[in-house]
Amino acid sequence: MNAEKTSVAPNVDHAEIAKFEAVASRWWDLEGEFKPLHRINPLRLGYIAERSGGLFGKKVLDVGCGGGILAESMAREGATVTGLDMGAEPLQVAKLHALESGIQVDYVQETVEEHAAKHPQQYDVVTCMEMLEHVPDPQSVVHACARLVKPGGQVFFSTINRNGKAWLMAVVGAEYVMKMVPKGTHDVKKFIKPAELLSWVDQTTLKEQHIIGLHYNPLTNTFKLAPGVDVNYMLHTTAKQD
């Protein structure tokens, strides 16, 4: 087993947390700042469920769960879900929405590194969606996710590629032209090239299984999963068997 990196200081960017705390009350507003997350959630959920062989009866961890959009939808599929986030306001919104929806999700305010120290190899599926580009040390998050999943389990990451097209689409287009997300949501310097993410994965017990792009068509106002990872992309990995 390869040595895996562990952070000493909490792997938290408080400015990033503050961005999401400021708009947390509108997390479940289908026409608000998080409309794109609601729009792409069925695609994410379908990809995760299909690549995992279904979610029913599985123990799932959603890292960087925010207000709980993906976490709740996985719980609706019959999974036992834990949602992890360091933002107090988004977690409070998530807890209240789950209560109103009658959906059972265990929400915890804790870093993924802290959670991995307490719960190694506890989860069948670990998801980490659009979170890596919001922390100081994304490599540490990848290593922690690898420690959390059971041997043979599934780990999913999604993030944004770092190149000129991604800057135009995810920052200029999404934040300033289309106004799909609040200005300042993304910092292109924190975007992650697929080769970088795969190199971190290779340092762990995880093995790449599949990578796919998430594409937006402004003419039809639709999202789809398809080949091409030059902007948004999702990575499916599995943990090696003991």
UniProtKB/Swiss-Prot annotation:
Any GO molecular function: 3-demethylubiquinol 3-O-methyltransferase activity
CDD domains on file: AdoMet_MTases
Cited InterPro entries: SAM-dependent_MTases_sf, UbiG_MeTrfase
Catalyzed reactions per annotation: a 3-demethylubiquinol + S-adenosyl-L-methionine = a ubiquinol + S-adenosyl-L-homocysteine + H(+); a 3-(all-trans-polyprenyl)benzene-1,2-diol + S-adenosyl-L-methionine = a 2-methoxy-6-(all-trans-polyprenyl)phenol + S-adenosyl-L-homocysteine + H(+)
Gene3D superfamilies referenced in this protein's UniProt entry, alphabetically: Vaccinia Virus protein VP39
Binding site for S-adenosyl-L-methionine: R44, G64, D85, M129
Keywords assigned: Methyltransferase, S-adenosyl-L-methionine, Transferase, Ubiquinone biosynthesis
HAMAP family named among the record's database cross-references: UbiG (MF_00472)
Protein name: Ubiquinone biosynthesis O-methyltransferase
Organism: Klebsiella pneumoniae (strain 342)
Lineage: Bacteria, Pseudomonadati, Pseudomonadota, Gammaproteobacteria, Enterobacterales
Gene coding for it: ubiG
